[in-house]
Amino acid sequence: SPLYALHNLVLAKAAAPPCPDAVRLTLDRAPAPAEVTDFMMRGEDDPGAWDNFYSELCTKLARGAAEVWAVRREGALVSTAGAYALSPDTAYLAAVETLEALRGQGIGGWLTGLLAADLAARGRRVALSCKKERLNFYHRLGFAAEDTVQRYALDGLPEEK
């Protein structure tokens, strides 16, 4: 099983970049859970994956243990970011996703920066884990390294993104 590193980061200074396409992009601070699930599960082959994600998301949202934001372009979801583990003092970001055709345009960075800054302004420590390839993305948004952990990818199971 291959070994890989996950880098744990914490928001040091909020740095939300400007909206990259203000004419056509709109921020949605409470997208419908089914729509978020459709977006996150597109291309997923496991028939139970949609149900599992949706059920967990609905439960966390209902309990105040998660918050998900999205960006829409001409009404359609094109990017999401979420704090999928919320406590009174900490928010763990995960599942930052932008449609592949729109990556590299600053949409995901804008959304993640806004969500992180908002959570921090409400008194939460904002943290996340990412692979080495994503470090520069998060550093530009004001995140700083906290520590690194080693993980094993089990044969036959997909690695975490």
Regions found by a protein language model. Name each.
Residues 1-2, 109, 132-149:
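Conserved active-site alpha-helix within GNAT-family acetyltransferase domains
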Residues 1-24, 149-157:
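Acyl-donor-binding surface of acyltransferase catalytic domains
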Residues 22-38:
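A short beta-loop-alpha structural element at the N-terminal edge
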Residues 38-52:
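Helix-loop element at the rim of GNAT/NAT acetyltransferase active sites that forms part
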Residues 49-97:
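A conserved beta-strand-loop-helix scaffold within acyl/acetyltransferase catalytic domains
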Residues 76-90, 123, 144-161:
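Acyl-donor (CoA/ACP) binding surface of acyl/acetyltransferases
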Residues 94, 98-100, 104-121, 140:
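Conserved acetyl-CoA-binding loop-helix of GNAT-fold acetyltransferases
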Residues 119-131:
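Conserved GNAT acetyl-CoA-binding A-motif
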